[in-house]
C-alpha cells in the first residue's frame, strides 16, 4: 500500500509538471497505464496477494488509478479546447461569402426521356397506365393476337417462370387490361420495364418501353401519322424528316415502322405503330365495327441514345457517375 501511495503521488507530480502539449499527455498515459505501465504492473502484482486481501487492495488500486485518469482526461480536454480556440482565432472567416454548394443528384437519362414523353402525351389528354411486370401468356401473347407458334414465345427470347407466367416482353399487356376495364374513348400512355433474353451493344435483358393506345369511333391512320410527326418534332426539338415503312405486327393492321433522317443523312428507326387489330378489340369485348384504335410502341433507351448521341446501350445500366453526370 505504501508503494501505491508513492506511485500516486509521483503520477500527480508528473502531471502537474507537464507543459501544455497533447503529445506529452499521451506519453504520460502510456508510461502509467500502457501495457507495461506502472499501474498495470501494480495490478499484476495482485496475484501475489492472498485471496482474502486481494479485493480490498484491488479496489484501492483502481480508485487511485481512476483519480489520476480523471486529472489526465480533464487536462486533455482543456488543452484540446485551447488548441481549437487558438485555431479559430487565427482563421479569418468572411460570413458574407456564400456557403459551400451542396452536391445534388440528377435524374437518370432514361427517366428524363420517360418524363419528356409522358409530359407530351399527357398534355394531349392521355392518362398514364401501368401493369404487372410478371405477366401471364394470355396478356403478353394470346390477347394480342400472337399465335402459339410465334417465335417471340421461344425460350431464347422470353424469360419464362412456368408454362403460363413470364417476365413481360412488352408493355402491350397494359393496353389489354385497360380495355377490359374501360369503355371507349380510351387514351393511355404506358411506360414500364420489359424483359428479353438478349445482351449486346444495342440490347439488354431489361429495358424500358412506352406504349400509346387510342380507341374511339373515328380513330384513323391519318391521326396516327400526325400525332407521331408532332411528337418526334417536339422530342428531338427539330423539324425532322419522317418516313413510315410498311411492317407487320400481330396486334396491329395495318402496321408501320417509323424512321427519322439524322444529320448524317441516314434513316434511323425510332418506333413502331399501327391500327389496333380487330381481333385484339374483340378479345376485350370492343366491337371493331363500331370502334377503331391505334397503338404506338417505342424503346425508351433507343430514343435516349438518339437524343444524346449515346453509342452503347449498356452505358445506361453500369452506374458510371462520369457518364450519368453529363445529364444533370
From Swiss-Prot:
<dbReference type="GO" id="GO:0005524">
    <property type="term" value="F:ATP binding"/>
</dbReference>
<dbReference type="Pfam" id="PF02912">
    <property type="entry name" value="Phe_tRNA-synt_N"/>
</dbReference>
<dbReference type="InterPro" id="IPR002319">
    <property type="entry name" value="Phenylalanyl-tRNA_Synthase"/>
</dbReference>
<dbReference type="InterPro" id="IPR022911">
    <property type="entry name" value="Phe_tRNA_ligase_alpha1_bac"/>
</dbReference>
<dbReference type="Pfam" id="PF01409">
    <property type="entry name" value="tRNA-synt_2d"/>
</dbReference>
<dbReference type="InterPro" id="IPR045864">
    <property type="entry name" value="aa-tRNA-synth_II/BPL/LPL"/>
</dbReference>
<keyword id="KW-0963">Cytoplasm</keyword>
<dbReference type="GO" id="GO:0005737">
    <property type="term" value="C:cytoplasm"/>
</dbReference>
<keyword id="KW-0460">Magnesium</keyword>
<keyword id="KW-0479">Metal-binding</keyword>
<comment type="subunit">
    <text>Tetramer of two alpha and two beta subunits.</text>
</comment>
<keyword id="KW-0648">Protein biosynthesis</keyword>
<keyword id="KW-0547">Nucleotide-binding</keyword>
<feature type="binding site">
    <location>
        <position position="253"/>
    </location>
    <ligand>
        <name>Mg(2+)</name>
    </ligand>
</feature>
<keyword id="KW-0067">ATP-binding</keyword>
<dbReference type="GO" id="GO:0000287">
    <property type="term" value="F:magnesium ion binding"/>
</dbReference>
<dbReference type="GO" id="GO:0000049">
    <property type="term" value="F:tRNA binding"/>
</dbReference>
<comment type="similarity">
    <text>Belongs to the class-II aminoacyl-tRNA synthetase family. Phe-tRNA synthetase alpha subunit type 1 subfamily.</text>
</comment>
<dbReference type="GO" id="GO:0004826">
    <property type="term" value="F:phenylalanine-tRNA ligase activity"/>
</dbReference>
<dbReference type="InterPro" id="IPR004529">
    <property type="entry name" value="Phe-tRNA-synth_IIc_asu"/>
</dbReference>
<keyword id="KW-0030">Aminoacyl-tRNA synthetase</keyword>
<protein>
    <recommendedName>
        <fullName>Phenylalanine--tRNA ligase alpha subunit</fullName>
        <ecNumber>6.1.1.20</ecNumber>
    </recommendedName>
</protein>
<dbReference type="GO" id="GO:0006432">
    <property type="term" value="P:phenylalanyl-tRNA aminoacylation"/>
</dbReference>
<dbReference type="InterPro" id="IPR010978">
    <property type="entry name" value="tRNA-bd_arm"/>
</dbReference>
<dbReference type="InterPro" id="IPR006195">
    <property type="entry name" value="aa-tRNA-synth_II"/>
</dbReference>
<keyword id="KW-0436">Ligase</keyword>
<dbReference type="InterPro" id="IPR004188">
    <property type="entry name" value="Phe-tRNA_ligase_II_N"/>
</dbReference>
Amino acid at each position: 500500500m505504501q508503494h501505491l501511495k508513492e506511485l500516486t503521488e509521483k503520477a500527480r507530480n508528473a502531471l502537474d509538471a507537464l507543459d501544455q502539449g497533447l503529445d506529452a499527455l499521451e506519453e504520460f498515459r502510456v508510461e502509467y497505464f500502457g501495457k507495461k505501465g506502472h499501474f498495470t504492473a501494480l495490478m499484476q502484482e495482485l496475484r501475489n496477494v492472498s485471496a482474502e486481501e486481494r479485493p480490498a487492495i484491488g479496489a484501492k488500486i483502481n480508485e487511485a488509478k481512476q483519480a489520476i485518469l480523471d486529472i489526465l482526461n480533464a487536462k486533455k480536454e482543456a488543452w484540446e479546447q485551447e488548441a481549437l480556440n487558438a485555431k479559430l482565432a487565427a482563421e479569418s472567416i468572411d460570413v458574407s461569402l456564400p456557403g459551400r454548394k451542396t452536391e445534388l443528384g440528377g435524374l437518370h437519362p432514361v427517366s428524363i426521356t420517360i418524363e419528356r414523353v409522358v409530359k407530351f402525351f399527357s398534355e394531349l389528354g392521355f392518362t398514364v397506365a401501368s401493369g404487372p411486370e410478371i405477366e401471364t401468356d394470355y396478356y403478353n401473347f394470346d390477347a394480342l393476337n400472337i399465335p402459339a407458334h410465334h417465335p417471340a414465345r421461344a425460350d431464347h427470347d422470353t424469360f419464362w417462370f412456368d408454362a403460363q407466367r413470364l417476365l413481360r416482353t412488352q408493355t402491350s399487356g397494359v393496353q389489354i387490361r385497360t380495355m377490359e376495364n374501360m369503355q371507349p374513348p380510351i387514351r393511355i400512355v404506358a411506360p414500364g420495364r420489359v424483359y428479353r433474353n438478349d445482351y449486346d451493344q444495342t440490347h439488354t435483358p431489361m429495358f424500358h418501353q412506352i406504349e400509346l393506345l387510342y380507341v374511339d369511333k373515328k380513330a384513323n391512320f391519318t391521326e396516327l401519322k400526325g400525332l407521331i410527326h408532332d411528337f418526334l418534332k417536339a422530342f428531338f426539338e427539330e423539324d425532322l424528316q419522317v418516313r413510315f415503312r410498311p411492317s407487320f405486327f400481330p396486334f396491329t393492321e395495318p402496321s408501320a415502322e417509323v424512321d427519322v433522317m439524322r444529320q448524317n443523312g441516314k434513316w434511323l428507326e425510332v418506333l413502331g405503330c399501327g391500327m389496333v387489330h380487330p381481333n385484339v378489340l374483340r378479345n376485350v369485348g370492343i366491337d371493331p365495327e363500331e370502334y377503331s384504335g391505334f397503338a404506338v410502341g417505342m424503346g425508351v433507351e433507343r430514343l435516349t441514345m438518339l437524343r444524346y448521341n449515346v453509342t452503347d446501350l449498356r452505358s445506361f445500366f453500369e452506374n458510371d457517375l462520369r457518364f450519368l453526370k453529363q445529364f444533370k
